[in-house]
Amino acid sequence: MAPHSDFIGEIGLDFSRQGMSSKTIQERLFEEVLSTIRDRPRFITLHSRGAEGAVLECLRRHGIKAAVFHWFSGSIKVLEDVFAEGHFVSINPAMIASASGQRVVEKSPKDRILVESDGPFTKVQNQVCSPPKVALVYQYL
């Protein structure tokens, strides 16, 4: 199905403590998906928890541009590289409620930001981040 789709997501790598047990298979499958979809431009959303640099390197190897890094939480150096390569980041209400998320927003060019709710999986102040909550992100920006 992926070879025929214009929208691919959410794909990527999770090198958090929970994800490390499947690191090898994640890397193999991610490389496989990227090699399958690199033939033409597509809208791609990425999961990169604890693996931002590794995900960016995979995109470079496959010549993929303009992907969206969902809830970027990596270093500012990697964030700068993400933008230098032509990619985007998505910002959600939980990010603007944390110091690290605010740093990502501050270092992100406005024309490289997409907003999202990430609901119903995320909460801010004990409230589920539903789509109407993205207004908080717009106000913050």
Regions flagged by a language model, labelled:
Residues 1-85, 103, 122-132:
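Divalent metal-binding pocket/active-site signature
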Residues 73, 93-97, 118-121:
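Short, acidic/turn-prone active-site loops that include or flank metal/cofactor-
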Residues 84-100:
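His/Asp/Glu-enriched short active-site or ligand-binding loop at hydrolase and phosphoryl-transfer sites
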Residues 102-103, 139:
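Active-site phosphate/pyrophosphate- and oxyanion-stabilizing loops and adjacent acidic/basic residues
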Residues 111-127:
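Short acidic/histidine-rich active-site segments
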Residues 131-141:
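Mid-to-C-terminal alpha-helical segments outside catalytic/metal-binding sites
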